[in-house]
């Protein structure tokens, strides 16, 4: 809504930004096994929200060359924006999480769980990603180019094996 009074417009924008600050649909954190409660995975499952948990990152190396402490990356995904301080921090506290990250791209962060786009980093198996609350790791991480590559592989297989037709039972 346009304002004639520029000060009122600035105040309105400031209130709007303050309300939105710290609110997003996707949040990430790190969990160190030695400082997390034994049942931290169960606590996440009991939330009934979409969560992805990386495989244990136990092969990561710091820039100095020394190994990083083993840790998990956790991605929480919600259907609507949530406030970090009042809604997300209590969850992170209950699982012994360290730090927070507001995630703009669920796909990008989900791919980071296994370092799919970082070949210089230790690689982790996507099969080991824990999916909770209806989160679909493969559905989130699949890129349009993956479909093209799959179709190309199928066509190569058909050609190499001289398959001309098939019969469905």
PLM-predicted stretches and their roles:
Residues 20-23, 45-47, 67-68:
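Flexible, charged surface loops at secondary-structure boundaries
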Residues 28, 51-92, 101, 110-114:
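Histidine-centered divalent-metal-coordination microenvironment in nucleic-acid enzymes
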């Amino acid at each position: 809504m346009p304002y004639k009074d520029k000060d009122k417009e600035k105040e309105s924008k400031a209130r709007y930004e303050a309300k939105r600050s710290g609110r997003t649909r996707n949040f990430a954190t790190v969990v160190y096994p030695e400082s997390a409660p034994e049942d931290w995975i169960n606590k996440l499952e009991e939330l009934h929200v979409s969560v992805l948990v990386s495989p244990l990152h136990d092969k990561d190396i710091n820039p100095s060359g020394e190994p990083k402490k083993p840790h998990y990356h956790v991605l929480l995904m919600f259907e609507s924006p949530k406030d970090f301080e009042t809604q997300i921090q209590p969850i992170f506290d209950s699982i012994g999480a360290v730090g927070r990250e507001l995630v703009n791209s669920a796909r990008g962060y989900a791919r980071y769980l296994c370092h799919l786009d970082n070949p210089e980093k230790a690689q982790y198996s996507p099969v080991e990603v824990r999916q909770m609350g209806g989160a679909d790791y493969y559905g989130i991480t699949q890129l349009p180019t993956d479909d093209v590559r799959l179709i190309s592989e199928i066509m190569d297989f058909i050609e190499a094996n001289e398959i001309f037709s098939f019969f469905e039972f």
